[in-house]
């Protein structure tokens, strides 16, 4: 024991002691103590609930090291499994589906795919709606999956169909508002080919000729008014075993022989008026064609 400690101990023992000394308690007592315990208990309960909610959210959302739920973060990008809903616009560079499943895009109203340039301007748009599918771009192309050749292309100047055959199955056929250029028009086997213009003219032109062929059927040309066959530099050639001209008018012929009018006429002579009109005249010993016939005079 040191000297200082000894002096302090002897001094404390020599101090007079009072019998009625008052003691003051040190600490938190009463309602303050109860409030402190209540807040500590409330904080503990909050921590437990918070921890339980965190564990429940991690369990429900399926948080892992690779991602969250159906969302997986890989080196190549983000991978989604199952059905995913996007409430806001989605900006991506490429969208791929799995090798064993298709890619399905679904919306309650429509599906719109936009393409923009580096300045943010809209360069192409594809909209799939409930009533129509609209494509807005400079050029629209449909290519074959095998060799990549263009099956259909459309732009402001022309529409090109690259398929081997264009088949129209509608009952009204194909309606063209303007001219059509094609090297070959044919119908399906055992079907009729019909070219019709209900309110205007139908014109077929070709610099090296127009050929109409019906190998196993008839060829009919019907019109309401006049049918013109015109050759400016050549000739009109009719070649068939039998050539029939029906509904030709019959001209009158005055004969001095009374027997010709009484007998039934079965043979007629084909006559031509100066204006080119054909008519029939009763055949006789000589020619019965007359330029003064009523057919030529009234034509």
Swiss-Prot record:
The keyword Transmembrane applies. The keyword Transmembrane applies. Disulfide bonds join 273-289. InterPro entries: Sarcoglycan (IPR006875), Sarcoglycan_gamma/delta/zeta (IPR039972). The chain crosses the membrane at residues 38-58. Residues 59-299 are extracellular. It is a single-pass type II membrane protein. One of its GO terms (biological process) is membrane organization. It is found in: Cell membrane, Sarcolemma; Cytoplasm, Cytoskeleton. One of its GO terms (cellular component) is sarcolemma. Its main location: membrane. It holds the Pfam family Sarcoglycan_1. Glycans are attached at residues 62, 110. Residues 1-37 are cytoplasmic. Keywords: Cell membrane, Cytoplasm, Cytoskeleton, Disulfide bond, Glycoprotein, Membrane, Signal-anchor, Transmembrane, Transmembrane helix. Component of the sarcoglycan complex, a subcomplex of the dystrophin-glycoprotein complex which forms a link between the F-actin cytoskeleton and the extracellular matrix. May play a role in the maintenance of striated muscle membrane stability. Belongs to the sarcoglycan beta/delta/gamma/zeta family. This is Zeta-sarcoglycan. It comes from Homo sapiens. The lineage of its organism: Eukaryota, Metazoa, Chordata, Craniata, Vertebrata.
């Amino acid at each position: 024991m040191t000297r200082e400690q000894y002096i302090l101990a002897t001094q404390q023992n020599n101090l007079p002691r009072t019998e009625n000394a008052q003691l003051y308690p040190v600490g938190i007592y009463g309602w303050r103590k109860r409030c402190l315990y209540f807040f500590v208990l409330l904080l503990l309960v909050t921590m437990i609930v918070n921890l339980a909610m965190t564990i429940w959210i991690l369990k429900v959302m399926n948080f892992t090291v690779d991602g969250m739920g159906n969302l997986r973060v890989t080196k190549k990008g983000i991978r989604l499994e199952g059905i995913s809903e996007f409430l806001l616009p989605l900006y991506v560079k490429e969208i791929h589906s799995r090798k064993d499943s298709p890619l399905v895009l679904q919306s309650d109203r429509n599906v719109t795919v936009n393409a923009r340039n580096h300045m943010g301007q809209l360069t192409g748009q594809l909209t799939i709606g409930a009533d129509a599918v609209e494509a807005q771009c400079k050029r629209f192309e449909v290519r074959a999956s095998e060799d990549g050749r263009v099956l259909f292309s459309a732009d402001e100047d022309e529409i090109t169909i690259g398929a081997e055959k264009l088949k129209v199955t509608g009952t009204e056929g194909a309606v063209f508002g303007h001219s059509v250029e094609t090297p070959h028009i044919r119908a399906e086997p055992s079907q009729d080919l019909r070219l019709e213009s209900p309110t205007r003219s139908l014109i077929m032109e070709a610099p090296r000729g127009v050929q109409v062929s019906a190998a196993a059927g008839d060829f009919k040309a019907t019109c309401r008014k006049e049918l013109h066959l015109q050759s400016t530099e050549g000739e009109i050639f009719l070649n068939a075993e039998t050539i029939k001209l029906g509904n030709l008018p019959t001209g009158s012929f005055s004969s001095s022989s009374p027997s010709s009018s009484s007998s039934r006429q079965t043979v007629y002579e084909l006559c031509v008026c100066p204006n080119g009109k054909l008519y029939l005249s009763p055949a006789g010993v000589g020619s019965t064609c007359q330029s003064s016939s009523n057919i030529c005079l009234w034509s």
